[in-house]
Amino acid sequence: MILQKRTADQILIIFILVVLLVILGCISVLTGSADIGIKELYALFNGSVDEFARNILLTIRLPRILAAVIMGGALAVSGFLLQVFFGNPIAGPYVLGVSSSAKLFVALVMVFLLKSGRVFSSFGMIAAAFLGSLLSMGIVLILAGKVRSMSLLVVCGVMIGYICSAITDFVVCFAEDSNIVNLHNWSLGSFSGTTMEYVQISFGIVFACLFLSFMLSKPIGAYQLGEAYARNMGVNIKALRVILILASSLLSATVTAFAGPISFVGIAVPHIMRGILKTAKPLIMIPACFLGGAIITLICDDIARTAFAPTELSISSVTAVGLAPVVILLLLRRGERRSE
């Protein structure tokens, strides 16, 4: 009876998150430096909206909002999968250097192609980011076999991130003057300039990864209880690990390719959702993390583009200020539990 009530409460919370996301999405459509209100939004639906408002809503705001929702959710799920894989509550795509490595590879491809006068495709950027993510994950996995302390492993991941960021800054210096501003803005993290093409591509990739992760909820749940238990339940540990690495890396790579590195969403959101839902079950956590990541990223993006309008902040700066305290609190609580 208690279990049924808890499950019902969790489903209710997920429903509330969906409603909250829809409300925030509507608010975001009406939020910006251009004075567009409910009247213009209504006119858009009945076809009587003027060209200026139409372009602002459909070309700028809607793609940006959808990108924030899709990519914020992707980062949160990526963080959850990495935390399951490493059994470490402070693992995440940004902390382990996955995002920074993906950023480096995309920067290399962008600078090389721009210098040679070639046009790079969306899939090319994703492929470059994915290779960068896999490289970082490979290094972390090698270190995991040699380093027993998970805290030390995370420190190594942070160092990998710093090295990749430093090399990226070095690479950007060799870009053409006309492209430096775009490269710099992208490297800081931003949804500015997102198009519906980017949204469609990212949605397809993210949806595929989410669907795969959700279908593997039971094996992932068994893996959370220990490798021995998972093996007894018939889980192919090696195959599951490969899937976790590929899915988390591809989710992180997709975000980095289109929006640049976005910090702390992947590490903080899974913990926030665990605290709210009082569970770590993947069947509940995967959709909850996606919704939580989407909501938080959407709020942070609204702050980034309106707080000092017309000047726009990088999304990563806002997420760092808002979510870094959550990570610090987590580390402090973890230290207190160990000392007891």
Place the predicted regions along the sequence by residue.
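Alpha-helical transmembrane segments in inner-membrane proteins
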Residues: 1-340
